[in-house]
Amino acid sequence: MEWKYIKKLKSIDLIDDFECLVKYVFCDEFRECVIANNGGRPSKKIFDTDKVKERVLKSFLSFNKEDRETVWKIFDWNKEELANKYVPFGIDNFGNLICFNANNDKIVFVNHEDMSVEAIAENFNGFMSKLYE
């Protein structure tokens, strides 16, 4: 898969710091993806949920605090709704979030307006394998 607009990760410690903030430990596959493609946009960006076909991933969120769309800003803006339930890592063009379910590591789509949730995949690898063009 090709990636565009990657923002070089300033420090691996940023991933650890975010994990401490949200009280969630990312899987190794996700950490490796962030290290290689922080804040990037994959060429395969379309995915289906259990309710809607052809949703579009705009980009992964950056772990660098000074970047425009970051896990830090998104979590801060939505912490009341997301706290202890969902950990954001991606965003679509409308501000909806792609998140880890903090209770079972499944990947979900969270509508930012009403916080409704749609299932995407059993885990991060499953999510990546479901992306298409």
Can you annotate each of these PLM segments?
Residues 96-102:
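Broad, structure-driven detector of short, well-ordered beta-strand segments within folded domains
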Residues 1, 100, 131-132:
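Alpha-helix C-terminal capping segments
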